[in-house]
Amino acid sequence: MKNLIIVESPAKARTIGTFLGKKYKVVASKGHIRDLPKSSFGIKVEEDGTFVPKYSIPREVNPTVKELRKLAKEAETIYIATDEDREGEAIGYHIAMAIKKEPESLPRIVFHEITKTAIENALENPRKLDMDAVNAQQARRLLDRIVGYKLSPLLASKIQKGLSAGRVQSSSLKIVVDREREIKVFKPEEYWTIEGLFEKNIESSIFAFNGKKIDKMSIKDEKMATEIVHSAKVESFVVESLEKKERKSKTPPPFMTSTLQQSASTQLGFSPKKTMMVAQKLYEGVKTNKGNMGVITYMRTDSLNLSEEAVGDARDYILDTFGSEYLPKTLKKYSSKSKGAQEAHEAIRPTMIGFTPIVAKDYLTGDEFKLYRLIYNRFLACQMNEARLESQTMLFKGQRSTFKANGRKLLFDGFYRVTGYSENDKLLPELKKGQQVTLDDIKPQQHFTEPPARYNEASLIKKLESLGIGRPSTYAPTITILQTRKYITIDKKRIHPTEIAFTVIKLLEEHFSEIVDSSFTSNMEADLDKINEGRLDWQKLLADFYEPFMQKIIDGKKSIKSQKMAIPTGEMCPKCGHELLRRKGRFGEFIACSNFPKCKYTTDLDGNPPPEPEKTDIKCDKCGEFMVIKDSKRGKFLACSAYPKCKNAQPLVPPRELDIPCPKCGSKILEKEGKRGTFYGCANYPKCRFISNGEPLKRKCPECESMVVHKVLKTGEFYECIDKKCKWKERVPNDKLKNP
């Protein structure tokens, strides 16, 4: 009989199956096949304090389990080949229990990449299931069930139905709420900057006045700014000093889960969830020039380790492709600063150095290629020499004022050869010390300090990682849960807490402070790491948490006052005659009929009902009914009056047409508004799927003649070639800036 290899996903099974002969059958469990029940608590606490999870097999996976049991009976050897992390170890344990085998009796094979060599090596070196890792995952699962199952009903009874709390979820939400609190109490402060333009077009800024150094907040008001400007205009200036320094730009480390999600968000516009979905495909197997195989290593990791073989391949490629000046004398090693990083794993890297982005483009889908290129280039970059830059500083001294000019020059591109370098050289002219210079222009500018920026998905993940909240596998799901539960909204890539989030966090801060305490959550993660390392008993961790937590639940049921906003108003509903109530929803307070859902009458607190949609004489192009004008967060729009039967919606104001043809089909290009802001798309959509987040321009790329777009990024505004193969980019001149 064949040997049986059990993995989680069908895609992974198909890829591994292509590497092995007829002696092996590779099948998938299709994820978790044994878990705590959805309909009950699922944890029994024995008299001696032992926690016994009551795992069950969900009905929908019974056919899979039946098939696995049948194959297991016929198999000569059964290999567990789930992912090498705690969750994978736990899935392997549950597979063994489901097919009625002793977990530690089954050989366990592990690999960081799905390639023929890696699978064959794993089969030659099987080990046992790591029960410490299994118990660490069981402890996490039971902790999350205890918090979610016991605290969520309390929130529902005291605030509003449908609310939930979670060990990682709630501490993450508090970070978002705290940032919004900072923004609400922020008071802007006035300050001024003064820019000087010296001869030969040398841009500078005020550095000192009357012998005192000027920093960002030194010039508090217009009076002081005016004094400096008037003085500088009549002063004579000389070059006081010239300084050139060489500095190195360090090579970036390879990607781990959090940094991949951050870079994919900022550079590709991918959400963390999308990044992990695409990375999963690249890991489990895609078409390549050498057949189906995984083209990146395992994507859920907090390690920066790299195999010596992979580094050796990268060094050979760098030497052959770029030359010896790009290759460090010794290989570069990196270590993770993440709390609890599992350094036995590898960083995320390509599995075949010969599968370059140029080759990969013919085999991968658009999103797969974008993410693969990001991973491939980062891996190469981490083994290349540092870039060298020259920074230039020049001081112009007058009788009272001193101005400072800065320049820079890229001396050696190093790793920028593969990652790209977006800054243009800004060279200062050759002047001599003591040489007289003329101040041609001077401009004072008023500013106000800005509140801290709201988190985007990338910066929130970075914050969670720095605080030790969660692990690589939990970052993306945590943000998704907060969105699903309507605790946050994401508008123009920024995370906003909803009204109900403030109410929930306030209650948790007052009565369950440890649940929203980042230090407590981080320490809990550290304890789970100790269980994984065999240094802490998982039952002790659960017992230490359970008793004080449950006492707070009992006390909370009695002492926490109801915050449900269902207060009688003493007024009657004009539609059905029932009493009107003052309620609190996810987006604030409102008045509603007590006869809901039979009567859906609502008004705002001032008694204004939701505005009736404005009728139009425009007919729906899908069903023929008339369109009406409705309001949304992003403004007014046209919607079909037959909603919800017909869900057709269109912008109220026709999109602006650009006087530029689509580079793909020649049709018109339209300026549109989407969830992430303004974008530009072909009028011939969906037949033509041209899209750009930069405004197309009439000018052509000087290197490849493709279309050029104007992009507004955090780092500034750039002209950029639309052809991804071409890396041409230049900074937009000051007089052409959209947001000066």
Locate each region found by the language model.
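Basic, low-complexity terminal or inter-domain segments flanking catalytic cores
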Residues: 2-3, 24, 98, 152, ...
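Structured, non-catalytic alpha/beta "coupling" segments that mediate domain-domain communication
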Residues: 14-38, 170-218, 381-426, 592-594
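Short, hydrophobic-biased segments on the C-terminal half of alpha helices
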Residues: 276-280, 479-480
